[in-house]
Regions:
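Conserved acidic donor-binding segment of nucleotide-sugar-dependent glycosyltransferases
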Residues: 66-76, 85-90
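Acidic donor-binding loop of glycosyltransferase active sites
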Residues: 22-37, 50
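Residue-level signal for the nucleotide or nucleotide-sugar donor/cofactor binding architecture
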Residues: 40, 74, 107
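C-terminal amphipathic helix plus adjacent low-complexity
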Residues: 92-193
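Short hydrophobic beta-strand element within catalytic cores of glycosyltransferases
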Residues: 51-57
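Two-component system phosphotransfer/interaction surface
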Residues: 77-88, 113-121
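Short alpha-helical segment that forms part of, or immediately flanks, the ligand-binding pocket
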Residues: 21, 40-47, 61
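Conserved catalytic-core segment of nucleotide-activated headgroup transferases in glycan assembly
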Residues: 1-17
Length: 193
């Protein structure tokens, strides 16, 4: 059964690599929000030459190079700031794009599998004494929210409610928007259920 969403989108399911690359090449910035475990999607995006914004979480700092991605503090304002920074700085986007393509030429999918298998083998066959410390690949600090993004967020929170007929199309649309935003904030750990 295909996934359903409360907002307009087109679920492409699994698409061939060529189509995936074409899709990424229609974008200016790739956004991935891996909050608990590493994702392969930022690597796909870098391979396609797409600058990437990801969350600054421990599960990402060991895998992702700081020249190809911006790891943002996991709050909406910082994520928006990182996206805006890339969009407002074409030279940064170009540099990230070129780095990502070059980096991924030396990082085939098999390399990731080999590294994973070696790590599992080391864990099973040793007493952990001779395993070298793994250092984060991403050495920058988290990309923080700009003052502009924080002010915008504050203004949005102060905004007066819009009153509409509670039986109309606009009301139903606004209710759906509110549910979607609430679910996003809950999933990001910003709002409690």
């Amino acid at each position: 059964m295909p996934a359903t969403f409360e907002f307009e989108c087109k679920n492409l399911n699994i698409i061939p690599i060529k189509e995936c690359n074409e899709l990424y090449n229609k974008c200016k910035v790739g956004i991935c929000m891996s909050a608990s475990n590493p994702s392969r999607i930022p690597f796909e995006m870098m391979s396609a030459g797409l600058p990437v914004v990801e969350l600054y979480k421990e599960n990402n700092i060991y895998d992702l190079p700081d020249e190809g991605v911006l790891l943002a503090q996991p709050i909406p304002e910082a994520i928006a700031s990182a996206i805006a920074y890339i969009l407002d700085n074409p030279q940064v986007a170009e540099k990230m794009s070129k780095f990502g393509v070059q980096y991924m030429k030396n990082y085939p999918l098999e390399k990731g599998f080999e590294e994973y298998l070696k790590a599992v083998k080391d864990m099973l066959e040793t007493d952990y004494k001779d395993i070298p410390e793994i250092k984060p690949l991403y050495k920058k600090s988290a990309f923080l929210a700009t003052e502009e993004a924080m002010k915008c967020s504050e203004e949005l929170q102060k905004a007066q409610p819009i009153y509409v007929d509670n039986h109309g199309k606009t009301y139903r649309f606004l209710r759906r928007c509110k549910r979607v935003l609430k679910n996003i904030l809950i999933k990001m750990g910003i709002k409690k259920q």
